[in-house]
């Protein structure tokens, strides 16, 4: 076959396959162009799920008449000069408009702020017509009709109009969060009108904009994040552990204002919550990373949704550390939606109802609290689990066992069979966050009273968290005891993996794992953590090598040790059906108030719920 040049139209259609995946991709590119033009008002109109019509109107700086033809030409842009590593605009490749024009009927109208009139150009299937004068307010209008008419095969991969319209809404919301000073509006024949008024600049304005997208509840259950390390700044808001969702759709990440879907960022977010929410639940978070453009490559993919950090370990450590610190400092704080879920359940069932109405599908459904929690799992593969996860040998970790027993002793279980009754308590206890214990019901739940609320505590879940935190503190207070192998185990690895793992030998030794390089492509393992018992050393070392290669950390071993501690805490805590004295119940409440993360157990279930007096009065029709 003869090698030849492709036509400009074919080139643009090939580029469109990477840039323009669906109607939402078009909106993303056009809205980003409007933001780069300095717009403060952006209006989006769609029809037919975006396949029939897409229109974006802005009040930005506009495009001069003599540059309109260039604007729809490939690789023509005003946002990039000669340094591809210093990218400060959302768009920079100069591919979006020509790619869109090659597969649709595109009309570009613009009037600069200092121009007396507007001009327009039309691109139909890649063929340019214009420019010619047109009546227009200052700003730019981009109208796209019959998307993919020139490549009808692409239409077969489109979803329903409703699904495509929803995807467009999600794109606008995701971009809008990062630019609260811009007013966004969505309208069209295929949707309910939606508007995000401008809220200004600063953290409060950003939180208000987030509330427009995620709802008022998020603001009531959010923790502010603001941390910096080695020139990388992390800001934003994360939900408290008990405010979580069943999927990851409520997680937003931005790098220098650009919305991204980076697996490293979301993996770090997941890691920060690993101890406080269930594995099948997802935290709600909005994170903004700001750093020198030279430290991040945004030119990884034409869609610009993926990025590559120069130091991914730094970014991961910053995210995990900042979020864990915020969670630890948040204190006792239940999700506001917990009480509302209870109220809805009561209203649905009615007093004395024989049949239960469906409960709200969220993490605070009373039915879900009664469900047995899933067993905690480590981050290791199923093959590792066959040897690493065996019945616990508590003799292997006497220091941890003693620490756990000390915590158990703080809330000793009475031998008496006397039932706990309503307890008198000093008034000052009612001023505490969890109040004063008043009774124990069903030998599992502690009922406490504060000055303005009623608190119900799951005694086993609460004590499980207390024991777990004590065991973790013991793990970090001193090096983990190791057990020497009679014969060192040699693990063959690629040379670069062996070198990286050997570089973390000192860190691994603190967790009871003794390793050293054994030739250019092997690691000798001389000692393993005693509390893990027998284990698949080969698999452990390979998993650690993979983790270090990807994240430059060896947190997987720590996660395994924490898993063992969590299992010990679960089996060593006050069990359901055990009767407690009033002073023991109050001691448990005070320990919860002093323990970070005590709002959830090790499996992510809530340890307590709080009903405000106003909520109770609403139940009885007093409000």
Swiss-Prot record:
Classification via NCBIfam families: mutl (TIGR00585), PRK00095.2-4 (NF000953)
Positions with biased composition (Polar residues): 353-368
Record's protein name: DNA mismatch repair protein MutL
GO CC annotations, alphabetized: mismatch repair complex
Annotated stretches, region: Disordered: 353-389
InterPro entries reported in the protein's UniProt record: DNA_mismatch_repair_CS (IPR014762), DNA_mismatch_repair_MutL (IPR020667), DNA_mismatch_S5_2-like (IPR013507), HATPase_C_sf (IPR036890), MutL/Mlh/PMS (IPR002099), MutL/Mlh/Pms-like (IPR038973), MutL_C (IPR014790), MutL_C_dimsub (IPR042120)
Biological role stated in the UniProt entry: This protein is involved in the repair of mismatches in DNA. It is required for dam-dependent methyl-directed DNA mismatch repair. May act as a 'molecular matchmaker', a protein that promotes the formation of a stable complex between two or more DNA-binding proteins in an ATP-dependent manner without itself being part of a final effector complex.
CDD domains referenced in this protein's UniProt entry, alphabetically: HATPase_MutL-MLH-PMS-like, MutL_Trans
Biological process, per Gene Ontology: mismatch repair
The entry's keywords: DNA damage, DNA repair
Keyword check for DNA damage: yes
GO molecular function terms listed in the Swiss-Prot or TrEMBL record: ATP binding; ATP hydrolysis activity; ATP-dependent DNA damage sensor activity; mismatched DNA binding
Family per similarity comment: Belongs to the DNA mismatch repair MutL/HexB family.
Provenance organism: Brucella melitensis biotype 2 (strain ATCC 23457)
Transmembrane regions listed in the UniProt entry: none
């Amino acid at each position: 076959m003869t090698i030849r040049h492709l036509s400009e139209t074919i080139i643009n259609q090939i580029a469109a396959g990477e840039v323009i995946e669906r109607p939402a991709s078009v909106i993303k590119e056009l809205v980003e162009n409007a933001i780069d033009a300095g717009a403060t008002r952006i209006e989006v109109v769609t029809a037919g799920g975006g396949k029939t019509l897409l229109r974006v109107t802005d009040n930005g700086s506009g495009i001069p008449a003599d540059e309109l033809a260039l604007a729809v030409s490939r690789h023509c842009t005003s946002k990039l000069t000669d340094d591809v590593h210093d990218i400060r605009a959302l768009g920079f490749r100069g591919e979006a408009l020509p790619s869109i024009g090659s597969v649709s009927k595109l009309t570009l109208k613009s009037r600069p702020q200092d121009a007396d009139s507007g001009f327009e150009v039309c691109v139909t299937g890649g063929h340019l017509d214009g420019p010619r004068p047109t009546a227009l307010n200052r700003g730019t209008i981009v109208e796209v009709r019959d998307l993919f008419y020139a490549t009808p095969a692409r239409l077969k991969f489109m979803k329903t109009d409703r699904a495509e319209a929803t995807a467009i809404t999600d794109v606008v919301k995701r971009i809008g969060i990062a630019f609260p000073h811009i007013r966004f509006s969505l309208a069209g024949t295929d949707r309910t009108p939606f508007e995000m008024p401008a809220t200004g600049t600063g953290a409060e304005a950003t939180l208000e904009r987030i509330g427009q997208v995620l709802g008022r509840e998020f603001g009531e259950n959010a923790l502010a994040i603001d941390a910096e390390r080695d020139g990388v700044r992390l800001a934003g808001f994360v939900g408290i552990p008990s405010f979580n969702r069943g999927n990851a759709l409520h997680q937003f990440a931005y790098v220098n204002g650009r919305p991204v879907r980076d697996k490293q960022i979301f993996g770090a977010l997941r890691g920060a919550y690993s101890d406080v929410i269930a594995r099948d639940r997802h935290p709600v978070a909005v994170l903004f990373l700001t750093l020198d453009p030279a430290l991040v490559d945004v030119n990884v993919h034409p869609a610009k949704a993926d990025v590559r950090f120069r130091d991914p370990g730094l970014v991961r450590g910053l995210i995990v550390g900042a979020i864990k610190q915020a969670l630890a400092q948040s204190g006792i704080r239940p999700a506001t939606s917990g009480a509302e879920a209870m109220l809805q359940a009561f209203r649905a069932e009615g007093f004395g109802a024989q049949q239960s109405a469906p409960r709200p599908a969220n993490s605070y459904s009373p039915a879900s609290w009664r469900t047995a929690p899933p067993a905690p799992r480590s981050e290791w593969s199923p093959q590792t689990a066959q040897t690493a996860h065996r019945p616990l040998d508590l003799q292997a970790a006497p220091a941890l066992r003693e620490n756990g027993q000390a915590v158990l002793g703080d809330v000793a279980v009475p031998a008496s069979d006397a039932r706990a009754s309503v307890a008198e308590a000093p008034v000052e206890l009612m001023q505490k966050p969890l109040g004063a214990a008043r009774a124990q019901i069903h030998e599992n739940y502690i009922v406490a009273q504060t000055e303005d609320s009623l608190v119900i505590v799951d005694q086993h879940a609460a004590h499980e968290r207390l024991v777990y935190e004590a065991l973790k503190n013991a793990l970090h207070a001193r090096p983990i005891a190791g057990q020497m192998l009679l014969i060192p185990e040699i693990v063959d690895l690629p040379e670069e993996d062996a070198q990286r793992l050997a570089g973390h030998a000192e860190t691994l030794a603190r967790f009871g794992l003794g390793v050293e390089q054994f030739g250019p492509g092997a690691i000798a393992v001389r000692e393993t953590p005693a509390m893990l018992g027998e284990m698949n050393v080969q698999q452990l070392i390979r998993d650690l090598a993979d983790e270090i290669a990807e994240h430059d950390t060896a947190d997987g071993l720590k996660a395994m040790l924490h898993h063992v501690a969590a299992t010990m805490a679960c089996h060593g805590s006050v069990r359901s059906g055990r009767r407690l004295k009033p002073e023991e119940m109050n001691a448990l409440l005070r320990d919860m108030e002093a323990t970070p993360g005590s709002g959830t157990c090790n499996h992510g279930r809530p340890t307590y719920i709080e009903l405000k007096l106003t909520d109770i009065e609403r139940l009885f029709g007093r409000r």
